Swiss-Prot record:
Its EC number is 2.7.7.6. GO terms for cellular component: cytoplasm; DNA-directed RNA polymerase complex. The keyword Cytoplasm applies. The keyword Cytoplasm applies. It is found in: Cytoplasm. The gene is rpo1C. One of its GO terms (biological process) is DNA-templated transcription. Belongs to the RNA polymerase beta' chain family. This is DNA-directed RNA polymerase subunit Rpo1C. Pfam families: RNA_pol_Rpb1_5.
Amino acid sequence: MTEITNAIERTVEGTDLPKRLKDEVYESIEGRDVTDEQAVSIAEAVESRYLDTRVEPLDPVGTVSAQSIGEPGTQMTMNTFHYAGVAEIDVTQGLPRLIELVDARKTPDTPMMTVYLDDQHAENREKAHEVVWNIESTRILALGDVSTNVADMLVQVNLNEQTLDERMISAETVAEIIEDSLGVEVTQTGTTIEFGPAEPSYRRLLQLVEELREIVFKGIEEVSRVVIRKEDVDDGEEFILYTEGSAFGDVLDIEGVDASRTTCNNIHEVYRNLGVEAARETIIDETMNTLEEQGLGDVNIRHLMLVADIMTAEGTIESIGRHGISGNKNSVLARAAFEVTVNHLLDAAVHGEVDDLDGVTENVIVGKPIKLGTGDVNLRMGGATTDGSGRAD
């Protein structure tokens, strides 16, 4: 272990590193048995690498990012459903998932959440199951059998006592919920519940059965199923829940859930509950995970960060398409080059819009050098004064 001396601190604080990297340098030095000279060398080497990774002025980062994501994207599978390491849970992966993310779809094809538990519930299976039953929607067919008695015009429900105990719900509670939801008079005897239409009607009897099947007696309506798995983590093993369906805000309020680690693959739900910065992080993580699962994890994360920055720059989530970023550009020619060309040109002509030719696309269209790289550097010719202080008159 190395103690941080004044010399080391002066060197680290004198670098151009951001605070996060400085903290990591201190942590790395403290964790190693090194001399002051070696510690200074480490700090200087980190700064050198950091400066090397910075973008050159006028570098076309957008074009590079598009190519760096798009080219590996040609190797992605078209399979919509794929087991993403979780038994029995289908998750959209590959190209369809990447398209979902950049299109900023309101609802993913396969919404899901990864729910982490607090210390009290994470290591105890019974405690973890308590959280499962508070999340997974419990409907009547999970609690017992439903039958119809046409002669007496009654719907009969025979509840399973073991299931009621397991899911921690009483027969009385089930009867009350049925009465409130369907507006019928319910008779409950032990684990048997009976009710029927106010007026004898076979159609109404069948309708009551259909309505009964839709009632959620416990849990969150949007979450149809929860899978519980024991997984290895940094400090041992813990139970983690994977859900089919998502209701991010509701899950964060449930007792036993670790809200600081729980994630959701619906970026709009994250935005509504945690704000735009959390949504940006989710876009980056989901995109990176999608690429890694296809064996394309060597794509530099900064390209994905740029995409996420553009999508969230206005404080909301915008898609990359004609209804989002591409359709809202200031340049008429850039908008027209993307989609619905005639409509954009016609609207611009009607409103007398002017294109300042500031971007890449519009300059390519009119055959002018783009204002990036050497295209945005002006060379001024002139002689120097005799003392070298400036340009001669």
